[in-house]
Amino acid sequence: MTSILTNNSAMAALSTLRSISSSMEDTQSRISSGLRVGSASDNAAYWSIATTMRSDNQALSAVQDALGLGAAKVDTAYSGMESAIEVVKEIKAKLVAATEDGVDKAKIQEEITQLKDQLTSIAEAASFSGENWLQADLSGGPVTKSVVGGFVRDSSGAVSVKKVDYSLNTDTVLFDTTGNTGILDKVYNVSQASVTLPVNVNGTTSEYTVGAYNVDDLIDASATFDGDYANVGAGALAGDYVKVQGSWVKAVDVAATGQEVVYDDGTTKWGVDTTVTGAPATNVAAPASIATIDITIAAQAGNLDALIAGVDEALTDMTSAAASLGSISSRIDLQSDFVNKLSDSIDSGVGRLVDADMNEESTRLKALQTQQQLAIQALSIANSDSQNVLSLFR
């Protein structure tokens, strides 16, 4: 039926045109934004996941920046420790040179003093962004330094920041700013050489292990010698010594003990001191810390071997600290690479969820444009029906 009040054909054509126009708007929006899911109304589940992951990716970007800052701190500390190790090696070499007979210890001490000043400069300069890992206040115990290492969201949705910790303690800092517990300002304990000797007491021979000294130790301590007997008047090695089986050991007056006499100077009968004071010590304090080395002082000059052993102990701790810093630096580099890859993976995953396929969208737009033209043509034809009715009355 043809009606001049209701044009069903035009209404159908108009509805189709509106639908096509709406689809074109959606397609053009996806093309202009590049997103298939641009809002929660497009796909609530995908939009929620994408929004959360984008937030996490921003946090990872901050982690990446923090890792760069942490790497700079660690690298600064490592470089300082590495330089300090080389300086301490030089100090050790100077001390070894000082053991030679006839050397000018005062001149060697001048060089050592310059090297000690260099160590102080290295420790003070090894600072980045206001943090120094080579010197610290250890009065309250070890100090923990942390570097941000990661951002984690667990299966329950809870988030946390992971950190890489490094302890500043007596074995890792060069100087304790409030005490003497750093590697360079503490006195190390060193092991003393020993010798096991048979000692006859009242006809019974027993084995005793006692501290052993070489003749150079005694000479450096300004000892006076009388055959197999020596006396050191003052300093760290002050006391009496006798030579037994090629080793110099602490001596004791044994006139009333029944012990075998090793040396008789006509006044005193000397034997091996088998008491605690004559036993070998495994925790003998070195004469000085590296920071207080002064071989012009008799107590240090007379015990250079122990001083060198103390420096060697310090080098061991410094090497260990440098190794720890190196391992942390390597870990930070690995973590940085991982964070970069993780960030790329998140970007890729979010893209799969919400990005528009531009090839598909452009093809769809072309089809919709064609449909729109056809719908406009159909609407035009439908609207012309009323004109055809009018012509019947002419």
From Swiss-Prot:
InterPro entries: Flagellin (IPR001492), Flagellin_C (IPR046358), Flagellin_N (IPR001029). One of its GO terms (cellular component) is bacterial-type flagellum. Keywords: Bacterial flagellum, Secreted. GO terms for molecular function: structural molecule activity. It comes from the Bacteria. It is found in: Secreted; Bacterial flagellum. Transmembrane segments: none annotated. The keyword Secreted applies. Flagellin is the subunit protein which polymerizes to form the filaments of bacterial flagella. Homomer of FlaA is able to form a functional filament. Belongs to the bacterial flagellin family. This is Flagellin A. It comes from Rhizobium meliloti (strain 1021) (Ensifer meliloti). The lineage of its organism: Bacteria, Pseudomonadati, Pseudomonadota, Alphaproteobacteria, Hyphomicrobiales.
